[in-house]
Amino acid sequence: PLIPSLSPYCDVKKAEETYRFAINEGSPDCFGHPKLFSHILMERILEELGLNTFFSSYKGFTKLQYDVYGFARLLIFGRLLNPASKYMTVRQNEDYYEPILKDFNPDNVYDTLDFIADNKDKIIRRINTNLVKKAHRSPEIIYYDVTNFYFEIGEPDEDTFDEDGNLIEKGQRKIGVCKEERKLPIVQMGLFMDDAGIPIAIETFPGNTLDHLTLRPALKKNINGLDFSRFIMVA
């Protein structure tokens, strides 16, 4: 193969399969939509990162009634192969040689997003554990940068207070300094990346948070618990 590291996978012999079918000239079966095969390589990467066992174990623990890992795979593959909205990504299910999802409700894609958000920190730790073990990740330099996303909504999110006026939760979509100079509510997002260019973690902040005020809380929440050795932070 062109990529030497793929040799172990190319040398594996698979059982021969025989297919027999008959078509007539002019039959709709003569025309087919191209099918995607490249996700087979990405499947292996997800397995090496331990995401297949992570989602499977949590599905059993939480007794989810839908294929949360199937939806997650579809979202990941779609983002890499053919980026689209979440709903349109689900509709790409039939574009794969073997559909990712079998019997499913498309609306469960939004439940999957909730699951990923609720377990973000656990997912990041699982990925990092396997990158340290299998790819020997031990960054000497960690890079950090901040960007933001704007939302086409009329008003920013309101903060939530208790009966005594104490702040319970701060709204995320706030008016701030938009990178695209739009006068719309934004959300700040900080990204950590290792010296190999591989993302480590992300963290979001209310849109009116200044960039330099995001580093310390993001570092404490996402990096301090990953047991990295000494490193230089470039922000």
Model-derived segments and spans:
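Short Pro/Gly-enriched beta-strand edge/turn motifs at strand-loop
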Residues: 169-175
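Active-site beta-loop-alpha junctions of metal-dependent nucleic acid enzymes
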Residues: 203-225
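Short, glycine/acidic-rich beta->alpha junctions
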Residues: 69, 214, 235
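Conserved helix-loop functional segments at active or binding sites
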Residues: 95, 115, 220-228
